[in-house]
């Protein structure tokens, strides 16, 4: 027994010694590997260095945050990428004599064999860090973030050699022509370009720093200009409507394209100007008759017909809508798309007009304001919109007094930036103008009768005065009257939106399209100037003075053609920031409506003519769009609001929607009864297809998703993985009457004949059920068995071609899937913002404590943490690593069961949300039901959305109840409402459509 214990003791000690030896040996090997893989050549003005660091096994989906720095700020323009190391050769026997035992030979052989086997299966990754540096003395490079390391760099001084005269560029520093240096500098440049492309391909990462630096360095050192377009991006034809739609919506891809365009060197602009082209020749739509006694709200008679019209009917409705946009994502746009930055458009509008809503206004606004509407000629809230607010006063003297007091207070508050209040004359009327030199505040105020108008645009003041003096108004137009026939004032919409044909025509007019592209280029120029200023400070160390455009151009930070523009505008420094000489400060540009020009370049004219020809021939007319929202209580015992939504495109020009007309069959008053336990289902009445060989009747396609736990999102790469995911989906897809798609497949791939119960199985494991005219598919036979009980055609209360129903996803088992998907997207977006801050620190030498403010200034937006936290600056450690920004909501990383944490970085495809995480929209979304109907004269979307009430203070709740009372319960037939007030194009009842079809030989 004593002998056995002694043996165990000796064995334990031996294992402990073995572990220590392995640990010591591994650390020594790592240190030797790092120090043994450093190359550095010193030269003027910059040397170049490259080092390799072992990183273990990394998944291709892993992202790393690594910041490269040194105590003396000698490192410039680092590039980080990843390489797979070559696996070691495995020999059956080693050459040379070797010891059979002793001196660690056995341990060494075991360790080597295990490592070789592992690396043959999964070769380790290497992190390659390349950078330029100043000086020739040894220095220490430090890596911070996902990897902490310190590496000694001892540069080798190369013989002096300058760039050949025919290669040297004017005003650009030369690089050494030593072969060793050129090999390494080419490797650095390739890595730098690849790093920029990776960042550009990340949709959640605004890679403007990398885009600017790659172009600047390429021009400086005569490298080839890289193609930095995103993967899959193609240049669209001028006759494609999407570029114009992108201009109207201000799509980010277009901004990125114009940013890159501003970086390229272009030939001198042609001085030949041509007249601005004519707009498209639009065809006026025929508007149905409206009765003379139709009720039109008086405020609509004060609105120019070319303006959009957003009416709230009361001040409390406006407050509700404002809270909805702020609490449900910060912006209406962010209610649909989770983003890493917020343009704060509500605050911009309040700042421009000086209309910040106070607590007093919230309590007493309805006692002073009887009606209000936001109007404007465009929706470009980010740049400087042409918008205004019309107030219908219950007490005009009190309302004007309140506004005047606010304007006087603003002059005192903003006196340091030159804010002034003055009376000017427009169209013979005295108008109050509150403004600052950079257009941060630009608020015109004018009143007529019981109406007060606040606007950013002088042109809108002129149009308001013209309309109020008797010129045609929006309320007078036949199309608006038709809208009010379909959506009567008596319906008391909490929010009513009307976008007229004239509004859309104005947006695609030559003035708007040409000026919009010009102002987006001006924004890109301001961004480039900001980055050039930071790069100048990083390289020269001069941070206290603001360099001129001439200085930046002469030193190669800006292209020679930077200030060359058709409209003659310039990028100028003013009050410590860059402005456009014609339009003002970014985010507060002069409204497009107030910019006058009659000439344009030949290129601009031709581009617009191409676009105009498309609209004149393909669209021919613009269709008005109207939306109404009403609030109801879903159930008095539940804290859930029901939003009843009606949306119309009417009068409808069917030609431009030919793709929709060809796909949809006529609306019918028949629907398919689907299983009640579906958490999501939809159905659409589709047109049949007839060919010489086959025939498919008009049919209903339907699909549903059960309340079951689906597979974890993101695991669908590869055909087999996708098939496994589809097999695990608790879903079904069907058609009635059977369209026959499957039976046309060759070689019997559509499955054999059904059994007595109607079931058959396809070759990929899909079950099929056929009976009573139905053909339904699912990977789960039990789902089909459940469908067989419920599926049948039944009469519907309304005519429709599309119907969708979504249950309360937050209480379903599907919520885990949505939470995981949203968490991964939010985490990657948050991490992208952190990497932007890293880029400012290591590429442009911005002090860590200033990186956030600089990023927000360059983007003209607030960086927001999509996880719901705040960005905070961590503390630098004792080893002098740089302080890095973090998110206060960043969770401990959890991965899918059966997976392992990445050794470095963050892998969003395998990460799982914390237990208490919930997708933001699941916190307030409680269900929806929508119907789509296309009629000869109208396109209709009607439905309900159930949401949690917006949190308000007790005082605000009391004020709302005293004014409007509690929300009523919805007691109207919403889905049949479009046919009650206007029946000109209502489908006729067709018993044939409602008759149950006979069993046919055609199948799904």
Q: What spans do the regions from the language model cover?
A:
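Extracytoplasmic/secreted proteins, especially bacterial periplasmic and envelope-associated proteins
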Residues: 355, 359, 398, 459-460, ...
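Secondary-structure transition/turn motif
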Residues: 435-439, 457-459, 644-652, 738-739, ...
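Conserved hydrophobic/amphipathic alpha-helical signal-anchor segments
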Residues: 810-856
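Extended, charge-rich low-complexity interaction segments
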Residues: 443-466, 511-539
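Structural boundary/hinge residues at secondary-structure and domain interfaces
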Residues: 36-87, 183-185, 189-422, 428-430, ...
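Periplasmic/extracellular, small/polar-rich flexible segments of pilin-like filament-forming proteins
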Residues: 855, 859-940
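Extended, solvent-exposed polar beta/coil surface segments
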Residues: 1-218
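Single conserved position on a long alpha-helix in the C-terminal lobe of the eukaryotic protein kinase
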Residues: 53-54, 61, 67, 71, ...
């Amino acid at each position: 027994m004593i002998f056995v214990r002694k043996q165990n003791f000796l064995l334990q000690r031996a294992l402990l010694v073995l572990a220590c030896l392995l640990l010591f040996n591994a650390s020594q090997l790592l240190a030797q590997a790092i120090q043994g893989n450093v190359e550095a050549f010193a030269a003027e003005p910059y040397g170049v260095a490259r080092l390799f660091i072992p990183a273990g096994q990394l998944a291709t989906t892993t992202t790393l945050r690594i910041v490269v720095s040194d105590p003396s700020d000698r490192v410039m323009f680092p590039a980080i990428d990843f390489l797979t190391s070559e696996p070691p050769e495995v020999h059956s026997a080693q050459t040379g004599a070797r010891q059979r035992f002793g001196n660690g030979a056995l341990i060494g052989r075991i360790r080597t064999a295990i490592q070789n086997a592992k690396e043959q299966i999964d070769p380790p990754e290497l992190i390659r860090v390349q950078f330029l540096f100043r000086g020739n003395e040894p220095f220490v490079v430090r890596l911070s973030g996902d990897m902490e390391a310190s590496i000694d760099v001892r540069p080798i001084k190369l013989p002096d050699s300058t760039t050949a005269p025919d290669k040297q560029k004017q005003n650009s520093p030369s690089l050494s022509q030593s072969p060793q240096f050129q090999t390494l500098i080419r490797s650095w440049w390739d890595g730098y370009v690849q790093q920029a492309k990776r960042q550009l391909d990340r949709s959640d990462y605004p890679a403007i720093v990398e885009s600017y630096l790659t172009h600047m360095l390429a021009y400086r050192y005569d490298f080839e200009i890289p193609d930095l377009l995103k993967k899959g991006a193609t240049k669209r034809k001028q006759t494609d409507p999407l570029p114009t739609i992108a201009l109207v919506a201000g799509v980010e891809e277009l901004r990125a394209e114009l940013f890159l365009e501003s970086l390229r060197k272009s030939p001198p602009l042609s001085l030949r100007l041509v007249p601005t082209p004519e707009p498209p020749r639009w065809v006026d739509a025929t508007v149905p008759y409206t009765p003379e006694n139709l009720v039109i709200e008086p405020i609509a008679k004060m609105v120019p017909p070319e303006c959009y019209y957003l009416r709230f009917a009361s001040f409390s409705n406006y407050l509700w809508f404002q809270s909805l946009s702020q609490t449900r994502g910060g912006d209406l746009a962010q209610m649909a798309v989770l983003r890493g930055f917020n343009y704060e458009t509500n605050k911009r509008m309040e700042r421009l007009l000086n209309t910040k809503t106070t607590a007093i206004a919230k309590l007493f606004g309805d006692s002073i304001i009887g009606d209000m509407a936001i109007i404007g000629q465009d929706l470009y809230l980010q740049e400087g919109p042409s918008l205004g607010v019309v107030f219908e006063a219950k007490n005009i003297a009190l309302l004007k007094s309140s506004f005047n007091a606010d304007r006087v207070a603003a002059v005192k508050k903003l006196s340091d930036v030159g804010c002034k209040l003055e009376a000017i004359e427009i169209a013979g009327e005295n108008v109050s103008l509150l403004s600052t030199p950079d257009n941060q505040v630009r608020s015109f105020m004018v009143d007529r009768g019981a109406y007060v108008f606040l606007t950013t645009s002088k042109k809108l003041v002129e149009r308001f005065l013209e309309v109020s003096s008797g010129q045609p108004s929006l309320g007078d137009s036949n199309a608006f009257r038709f809208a009010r026939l379909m959506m009567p004032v008596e319906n008391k919409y909490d929010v009513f939106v009307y976008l007229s044909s004239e509004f859309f025509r104005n947006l695609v007019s030559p003035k708007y399209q040409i000026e919009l592209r010009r102002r987006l280029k001006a924004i890109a120029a301001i961004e480039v100037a900001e980055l050039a200023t930071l790069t100048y400070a990083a390289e020269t160390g001069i941070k206290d003075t603001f360099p001129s455009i001439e200085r930046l151009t002469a030193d190669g930070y800006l292209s020679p053609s930077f200030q060359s523009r058709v409209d003659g505008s310039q990028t100028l420094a003013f009050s410590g920031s860059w402005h456009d000489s014609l339009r003002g400060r970014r985010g507060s540009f002069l409204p497009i409506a107030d910019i006058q020009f009659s000439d344009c370049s030949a290129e601009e004219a031709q581009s617009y003519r191409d676009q105009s020809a498309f609209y004149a021939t393909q669209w021919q007319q613009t269709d008005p769009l109207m939306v109404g929202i009403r609030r109801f209580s879903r159930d008095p015992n539940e804290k859930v609001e029901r939003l009843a939504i009606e949306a119309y495109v009417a009068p409808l020009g069917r030609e431009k929607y030919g793709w929709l007309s060809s796909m949809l069959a006529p609306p019918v008053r028949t629907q398919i009864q689907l299983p009640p336990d579906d958490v999501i289902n939809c159905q659409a009445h589709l047109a049949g297809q007839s060919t010489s060989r086959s025939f498919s009747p008009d049919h209903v396609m339907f699909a549903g998703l059960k309340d079951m736990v689906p597979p974890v999102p993101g695991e669908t790469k590869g055909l087999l993985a996708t098939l496994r995911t589809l097999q695990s989906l608790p879903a079904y897809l069907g058609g009635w009457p059977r369209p026959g798609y499957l039976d046309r497949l060759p070689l019997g791939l559509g499955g054999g004949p059904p059994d007595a119960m109607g079931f058959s199985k396809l070759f990929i494991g899909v079950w099929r059920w056929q009976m009573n005219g139905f053909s339904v598919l699912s990977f789960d036979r039990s789902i089909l068995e459940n469908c067989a009980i419920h599926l049948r055609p039944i009469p519907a209360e309304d005519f429709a071609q599309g119907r969708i129903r979504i249950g309360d996803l937050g209480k379903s088992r599907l919520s885990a899937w949505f939470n995981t998907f949203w968490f991964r997207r939010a985490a990657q977006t948050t991490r992208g913002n952190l990497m932007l801050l890293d880029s400012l620190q290591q590429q442009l030498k911005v002090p860590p404590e200033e990186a956030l403010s600089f990023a927000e200034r360059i983007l003209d937006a607030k960086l927001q943490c999509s996880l719901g936290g705040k960005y905070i600056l961590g503390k630098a450690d004792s080893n002098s690593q740089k302080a890095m920004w973090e998110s206060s909501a960043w969770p401990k990383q959890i991965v899918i069961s059966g997976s392992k944490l990445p050794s470095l970085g963050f892998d969003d495809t395998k990460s799982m949300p914390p237990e208490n995480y919930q997708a933001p929209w699941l916190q307030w979304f409680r269900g929806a039901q929508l119907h789509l109907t296309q009629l000869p004269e109208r396109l209709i979307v009607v439905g309900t959305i159930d949401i949690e009430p917006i949190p308000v203070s007790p005082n605000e709740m009391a004020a709302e109840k005293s004014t409007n009372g509690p929300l009523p319960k919805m007691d109207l037939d919403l889905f049949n409402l479009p046919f009650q007030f206007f029946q000109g194009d209502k489908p006729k009842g067709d018993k044939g459509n409602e008759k149950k079809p006979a069993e046919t030989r055609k199948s799904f």
